[in-house]
């Protein structure tokens, strides 16, 4: 079934949600094969396909080598190439590289964390991999400087897992890939971004909600604990255990 799944994924013309296809130059909702965008869905889809390929491509080859070839081509077409294409920076606005000072949100860490995982698992060209990592660091630096010093998520506590939580995912991926040489877990703003999830909690499963975020805590306890452990926040690890109780 894994082979069936990645084969199906490789045949799809796009992994982008139709609601986001309007950013194509064609301004149409159907995917234009001449242009590939990256959004929340395609990045996530690409990372899942890349993980499946990484662990099972030898098994796929036993069935038919065409499965692995098609998977490699699909990830390159849908994720790797458009990420490195300077002409796509306006469409991939979440990079923050098309126009400096532009508003950023949780798309930036979410997409970057998924895309960089695709590169680490699928890109065989070291020069392209280096470019991708450097670009992702530049993009994430813009996002981190966009966040206020108190570390609050401006989209509300319910978005924490898809904002600060994705920052943690991104940093953990690069930490693991570099054997710990790349680490921002000692940064105070990174810690405060994590602790926002516990400091916005008011009891009985409720948070101080605002923007379009819901009033109920919906962030996974394991993510809170892992984040807290990485940044050395007893507040977060204790809160994660409290949420499990």
What does each model-found stretch correspond to?
Residues 1, 7-16, 30-33, 44-65, ...:
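Well-ordered alpha-helical scaffold segments within catalytic/enzyme domains
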Residues 2, 129, 133-136, 160, ...:
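Hydrophobic packing residues in well-ordered alpha-helices of helical domains and bundles
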Residues 2-5, 21-23:
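"Short basic amphipathic alpha-helical interaction patches in structured regions
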Residues 8-13, 76-77, 137-149, 188-205:
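Short, mixed-charge aromatic SLiMs
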Residues 12-24, 38:
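Short, flexible active-site-proximal loops enriched in glycine and acidic residues
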Residues 15, 88-89, 152, 180, ...:
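Intrinsically disordered or highly flexible coil/loop and linker segments, enriched in small
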Residues 29-156:
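Active-site lining segments of carbohydrate-active enzymes
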Residues 95, 162-245:
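Carbohydrate-active enzyme catalytic cores, enriched for enzymes
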């Amino acid at each position: 079934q894994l082979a069936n799944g990645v084969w199906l994924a490789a045949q799809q013309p796009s992994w982008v949600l139709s609601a986001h296809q309007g950013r194509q130059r064609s301004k149409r909702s159907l995917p234009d094969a001449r242009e590939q965008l990256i959004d929340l869905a395609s990045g996530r889809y690409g990372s899942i396909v890349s993980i499946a390929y990484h662990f099972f491509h030898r098994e796929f080859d036993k069935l038919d080598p065409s499965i692995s070839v098609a998977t490699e081509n699909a990830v390159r077409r849908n994720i790797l190439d458009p990420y490195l294409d300077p002409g796509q920076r306006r469409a991939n606005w979440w990079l923050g590289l098309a126009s400096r000072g532009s508003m950023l949100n949780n798309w930036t860490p979410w997409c970057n964390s998924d895309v960089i995982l695709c590169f680490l698992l699928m890109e065989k060209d070291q020069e392209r991999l280096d470019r991708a990592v450097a670009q992702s660091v530049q993009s994430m630096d813009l996002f981190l400087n966009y966040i206020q010093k108190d570390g609050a998520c401006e989209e509300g506590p319910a978005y924490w897992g898809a904002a600060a939580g994705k920052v943690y995912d991104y940093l953990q991926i690069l930490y693991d890939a570099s054997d710990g040489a790349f680490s921002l877990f000692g940064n105070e703003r990174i810690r405060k971004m994590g602790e926002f999830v516990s400091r916005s909690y008011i009891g009985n499963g409720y948070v101080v909600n605002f923007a379009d975020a819901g009033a109920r805590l919906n962030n996974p306890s394991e993510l809170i604990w892992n984040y807290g452990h990485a940044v050395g926040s007893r507040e977060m690890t204790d809160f994660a255990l409290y949420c499990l109780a």
